[in-house]
Design a protein with these regions (language model features):
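Nucleotide-sugar-dependent glycosyltransferase catalytic domains
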Residues: 1-175
C-alpha cells in the first residue's frame, strides 16, 4: 500500500519545499507503476474505466491502452467554468471575474499534471507501452470526449455552473 510507504514526516517537519517535492516525485513514480499494473489487471474484461481526481491520469492512460471509454467522476468541480474559481486553487477575490475563474481551473489542472507528468510517462512507457502524454497534459485525450462527467455534490450546496455543457451531470452526494 503506497500510503504506508510514504514517509513524509521528515521533509514536512524540516519545512524544505524542495525535499518535500522530491520525495513526492519519487513516491509518485513508484506508485504509478504499481497503479498501472494493478489497473491493467483490474480492467481486464471491463467495458468502461471510471476515474476521479486522484486517478484521472492513470485512468486516461488505461482507457487509451484498452480503447475503452472513460467516465470521469468527481466530488468537486473539475471542469473549467466562469461561475466560480477552482476549489484546488487559492481563493480569488470576487472582482476577478469569470475569465480568471475559468483560468484557475486550467492552472490547477496544470499544477496537478506537472507534478505527476514524469510518473505518468514512466507508467505509460514501462507498463502500458504508450507514448508520453503531451507536456500540457492528456486533457484532450480521445477517451475523454463525448462521455458524461459525473459530479457527486449537491446543486443546493455548489450550484451547477450555467456554462457547463450537457455532458456535466451534478447528481447529488454519493454515499
Amino acid at each position: 500500500d503506497i500510503a504506508q510507504r510514504i514517509d513524509m514526516r521528515a521533509p514536512l517537519e524540516g519545512g524544505n519545499f524542495l525535499a518535500i517535492m522530491s520525495q513526492m516525485a519519487r513516491e509518485a513514480q513508484q506508485g504509478a507503476l504499481a497503479w498501472a499494473k494493478g489497473g491493467l489487471a483490474a480492467c481486464h474484461g471491463m467495458d468502461l474505466v471510471i476515474a476521479g481526481i486522484g486517478g484521472v491520469f492513470i485512468g486516461i492512460a488505461l482507457a487509451e491502452k484498452l480503447r475503452l471509454p472513460l467516465l470521469q467522476a468527481y466530488y468537486i468541480p473539475f471542469t473549467p467554468t466562469r461561475a466560480y474559481p477552482s476549489f484546488l486553487f487559492p481563493r480569488l477575490p470576487p472582482w476577478f471575474g469569470g475569465a480568471l475563474n475559468r483560468l484557475s481551473y486550467q492552472l490547477a489542472r496544470q499544477m496537478m499534471w506537472q507534478g505527476f507528468r514524469s510518473a505518468d510517462g514512466l507508467a505509460r512507457r514501462d507498463v502500458l507501452g504508450l507514448p508520453s502524454a503531451s507536456f500540457w497534459g492528456p486533457f484532450n485525450a480521445e477517451c475523454l470526449q463525448y462521455y458524461p462527467i459525473l459530479y457527486g455534490f449537491s446543486p443546493s450546496v455548489i450550484p451547477r455552473p450555467p456554462d457547463w455543457d450537457g455532458n456535466m451531470h451534478v447528481t447529488g452526494y454519493w454515499f
